[in-house]
Structure formats: structure tokens, C-alpha cells
């Protein structure tokens, strides 16, 4: 039963009813009763105190702080209300206000708690020297007997947090592990340890601690509905309860998703996010919202941009939000938007962007208007990074000579991080010449970087592409495509369809037809096996391979064979016709129509009839298939009636009739 107002509570039972609601965690109902009562008796200390407590439990920290402020004004002799006000302001991320209130507390009994709170505020503000000074004061025992020592669990956690923020992840791991052993299992502490392992790239122990948090959370709180959403079960939101917060389940699932994303297990990362306890979208925390945006960007880019833009207006927001939004704007070529966001948020630039990331974004934005200038900027950045890579290579060699495993590990991690910065710079340089179709220059850029990148999959893939595009280097392209395919041969559908298609074409162009046929049989076999488990699933790999081969023959002028191959590749239409496959098919038809209209080729009636019949099938099956995937933030949308395969296939059919002079 929900209590709407205090008038409905029987006489003499108001206090009992309120305490019963609080006992049952029905804080919203308790707030309704207490608010109504306080309208009649605004100076009730008990009422205000209970209302503040309920607001705090509901995570309405600003409202809780207002109540505690009133209480401290009404009862200045009771300093605990000022302490509670400061704690609520800290939880509301109002750090300057919280700091001001802590300075008003001078009761020695609260000295330790005040110092801890001040240290937490400094830490959250990013003032690490200030936070460390206060933590060391606590550890020294200056704040009193209850301030703990160096081996006290709280002290270990505080030092671990500081070490983590300072980038000393392994030292932080040691502190968190010691705290865990001293205090016994605690979900939040186990999460801290997992996070420190993650940041030091030790994913296996991080996942072990995450699994422990999730397993205990499921066992102790089955009511939180872990995994229900992924299984398609319609469940109610569990809300942002104190119990949910205490389990650290949300944090654990977010960290697991981040690890899977880093390991390029994108589907597992997406499932991990849906495995977490169900909450309504308005209840989601900033980290979950950020991760949802990032991990579903390919499928829902518009929604992803909206979420990241929304987060940028919040205080606080995950520190990665600003950089990720700018990088995604550049990825989707919204350079003007990226420039606007940088200009409007200069204060965030210095706080959230490293000098490397700022310089990289600046060069990417410059690419739009001054590609030559952008190339020079990127070249400067690449030069700086190659110097770092050479220095680290030398460090690793010296450490190996001295058999110093610790230095080897540290230098190797730093080398990997620097290489991950270098690759995007290199690719951005190459893209400038790629857009100009100057493929020899792209190849030259890649060859200059072979010293560092020859084992990097992204580099190898792009070298293969640029060799393939030069048309006289198919044999060299095979040398780069083949290892990528063979590495994933047992799960060949995990390889991009265009990579498989380009490898098949390269085989054909170098008279290795048997290898091409064997690869296509392997793809066909895997597609068949996959369709047994999910008959309705659309799989495009073999279709795209055949389309690219058909396109090759069309490009060589053999339209009879090429168009026939394109048509057959899309059968059956209900499983093979999609936006991507239609893109390849219509290019061949447009090329055919162009050459027919110039009277450069003549098709026999049988092939023309085959083309018309194919387009009629596309018209039938393409009603709900977009002809073009529009850019997520495009202001001028294509008319929905025109952006379908059905519309475009009708248009192509009409053009065929017009070119050959048939009457419709």
C-alpha cells in the first residue's frame, strides 16, 4: 500500500509507519509522508533528519544536503549534521561546497572522518598531491587513534587508490590485495583490484576477480535478475538500490565489457552489458551509458552520438567521453562538429586530452580543408612516436642482456601502448593519399613503417589492400591476405567478407583458380553449418565474394559472365539481398547501362531478360531493405520511399527498358 499523505496514517502511528517504510527500504513512500508532515511542522528535527536519511538512500544527495543544512542551522551545537551535509555534497559531486563545509568542523571527535572526507574530495578533484598529504597524515596517526595505520585496510585502500591514479598499477594491485586479505572479501575492493589488473593489461586475473564478483552477486541476490535481458526475458527494472551498489555488479559488468572490447570480442562485450541487472534508461549510470554508446556504435550510431553528447553535459562524466566523442566525429568525417566541440570546450581540452590525442585530433580536423598541412602535422607526430619506439626497443634489448624481467615487462607494455598510438597516425597519413588514389605513395608510407608494424594485423591488412588496388601486385597482396585468412581458417566467417573476396580475386588474377575454389567451398560449408542452427540468419560472405568476382569480370568487359555471376550470387533473395550486397550489384548494372548507352557493348535478349527478372525479384524482396545506410547525424534525410532496394531496382529496370528501346 502506498501512503499518499500523512492524513491517511492512523492517529498515533505516524512514527511507526515511517520507520516501517524505512525498514522495508520504501524510501520514496517515506519521503511523501515526511514531506507532507514537514509542511505542517517545518522545524521538526526528527522529521528533517529522517527525510535527509531517505533522500541519501535514494541517492538524491543535493536534497539530503539541503535537509542537513537546515538541521545544522537549527542545531549548530550538533556538528554531526555539518559532517553529514559535507558527505552529501561530496556524493553530489559538489566538491568546492563540500570542502567549505568541512572547514567549519573543528570538533576533535570528527577529525579523522573530516580528514578522510577531505582526502576523498581532493582525490575526486584530481588534486593527487593534496590527497596524498591528507592520507599520509591519517596513516601517521596525527588524526587520532582511530585514524588507522599503514597496514589498516582503509589505509591500504587509500594508498592503493592514489598509486592507481598516479599510474603505478602494479603497486596499487599489491595494496588492494593486502587490503582484501586483511579485511576479507568485499565486492568494491575486489573490483578495485580487478581494475588495477586491467589497467596494467593483466586481463586474466582481472577477469578472475570480476567472475568472483558476478558469481557471488548472483548467488546472494537472485532478485537482481542478472542475465535475464540477454536471454530475452521481459523483466522490471531493479532500480539503483543500495543492495545493487553494494554488490559492485554494475562496475564488474562494465569492466568485463571493456576487457572483451579491448580483446576485440565485440559481441561478447555487447552481451556483457545486457547481462547486468536490468534498469530503465533514465536510471543508468554514466559509465554504463558511455559503454553502451561505444559498443553499439556500429549498429546504432545516431543513438551512440546522442548518449555521448548527453554525457558531456553532465557533471561528472567518464573522463574518456570527451576524447571518444571527438574521435568518433572524425571517424564518421564530421570534422566541423569535432572542431566546434573543441572550440566550445577549451576547458575540457587540457583536462581530458593528452598532448598526443589533441595533436592527432587537430591534424584530423585539418585534413578536411588542408590535407598537405595535415600530413605535415601527422608526420611530426609520427616522428616523435618512432623515436619513442626506437628508444623502447633499445631498452628491451638492454634489459634482455641484463636478464631484468621487470624492466622487460614494463618496456614491452610501454612499447605496445606507443605502437597503438602510432598505427592511427600512420593510417591517417596513408588515407590522405588513398583518397587521392595515389596508391604507390600509400605503399611507400607503409614500407617506411615496416620496422615497427610488420607483426600488426591492422598494418598487414591495409598493406594488402593497397597492393590489391594497384592491380599489378596481386601476388604480393596474397602474401598479406593469406596469413590473415589462415589465422582464422577454423572460423573463417569471422574474417571480413571483403578480405576473402579480395583474396579470391587475387588467386584468380594469378591463375590460382583451385585455391580460389577451395576457399569458396570452405566459406560455403561454414555458412551451411551456421544456417542449420539459425535458418533465418542472413550471411553475406560467399555472396560478397561472388559479387566481387562478378564485378571483376564486368570491369574487364565480360558482362555476360560478370552479370550472370552477380545475379546468381544473390540467390536466395530473402537471405542474400541486403544493403551491402545491393551496393555491389547495382554498381555492375550501372556500369552495364553506361556502356550499353554508349553502344560499346550489346547484350543478347536472354541476358537482358535475366537482368529484368533479377531486378523484379529485388523489387519484390527489397521493400524493407535500405538502399543506402545514411550517415547518423545527416540533417537532410533521403525520402523513405526512395531509400529502398525496391525503388532503386524499379529505377534500374526503367533505365534498361529505355536503353534497349523496349516498351514498358
Curated annotation (Swiss-Prot):
Transmembrane parts of this sequence: none
GO MF terms, alphabetically ordered: intraciliary transport particle B binding
Coiled-coil annotated residue ranges, if any: 507-534
Keyword hit for Zinc: no
Segments annotated as TPR repeats: 11-44, 45-78, 153-186, 188-220, 393-423, 424-456, 458-491, 543-576
Cell compartment(s), UniProt: Cell projection, Cilium
Main location: other
Keyword line: Cell projection, Cilium, Cilium biogenesis/degradation, Coiled coil, Repeat, TPR repeat
Family per similarity comment: Belongs to the TTC30/dfy-1/fleer family.
Function: Required for polyglutamylation of axonemal tubulin. Plays a role in anterograde intraflagellar transport (IFT), the process by which cilia precursors are transported from the base of the cilium to the site of their incorporation at the tip.
Stored PANTHER family: INTRAFLAGELLAR TRANSPORT PROTEIN 70A1, TETRATRICOPEPTIDE REPEAT PROTEIN 30
Protein known as: Intraflagellar transport protein 70A1
